[in-house]
């Protein structure tokens, strides 16, 4: 399995989630299989998004796309996102 992990903060979670949901089809067309959004339990707007992708090449291509950059700007992402690409090594 191929994974992409994105860490960033947002100005307003609900506004961010609305934009995130609006680009669902774009993510799917580029190979996204599923996602999980995680928030810190202290109520902050620091998010971690874990995506399962069909392959790492598609994940990297999507992460570098102008469409993603534009969506992040519209969604109110603050600061520079941290993006990691991972392959599953073991599962329990």
PLM features per residue range, with description:
Residues 1-66, 70, 74-92:
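Short S/T/G/P-rich N-terminal loop/turn motif that feeds into the first structured element of a domain
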């Amino acid at each position: 399995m191929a994974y992409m992990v994105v860490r960033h903060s947002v100005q307003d979670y609900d506004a961010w989630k609305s934009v995130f949901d609006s680009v669902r089809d774009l993510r799917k067309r580029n190979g996204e299989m599923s996602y999980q959004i995680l928030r810190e339990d202290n109520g902050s707007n620091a998010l971690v998004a874990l995506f399962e992708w069909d392959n790492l090449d598609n994940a990297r291509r999507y992460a570098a796309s102008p469409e993603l950059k534009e969506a992040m700007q519209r969604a109110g992402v603050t600061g520079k996102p941290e993006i990691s690409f991972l392959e599953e090594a073991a599962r329990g």
